[in-house]
Amino acid sequence: FGVPMIEAEGASRSLFTQGYKYLFAVLSTTDLYLPGALNFAADQKKSIGKPASDARVAMAFEGDPFSMDIRAGLVEMIKDYGMKLVIDDQLPADLSDMSTTLTKVKALKPDILIISGHSKGAATAARQIDEMKINVPIIAMTHCEAAKVHEKFPNAATGFLCTTQWVPGIDKKDAMFGSAADWNADFKAAHPSYSSVPYQSAQASAAVYVWKEAFEAANS
């Protein structure tokens, strides 16, 4: 309809490959969620005098478009690095049990385990990694924050690499919100029922700000 849309929550890269000229976002898309984990695995190999291609990767992903977008980007990176993809599993639809994948992980001993299953998948992964005493040098996943894995499973989650769109401790500032800590404090003051602020709220605030700035810049 030719009406600009500033969206705050949809991160799937497929939203931005359909030619939607009026769709804009304030958040990182799925292709930017977990590449840092593979780069870290490559750096770890190089630090001990081995090539990045020596890294062995295990992945387990939910079958939804969001997770499949993330997987597609990682598969390309794995090929570019020449790494070995030793496990490439799709998680069960109800996300309540990933012991089959973790049993393979125990047997194959990959250098990095990457998981994307939204909040429920993250919680299941953390719980079963703890229960099954899984020991992988690098474990990376999405939705750690929403699943509160560091609070609920502190032993298992120590050392997890967790993607997030926003954290209150970042020291950057702007004229609208001040620092992330300032905005975090203001949000809690306005909404005292929140003990912790969801990153979705920060994204939503940023989207409103961008919308305002765009219309002012266009004199619309």
How would you label these PLM feature ranges?
Residues 1-87, 137-162:
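Extracytoplasmic ligand/sensor domains, especially the bilobed periplasmic-binding protein
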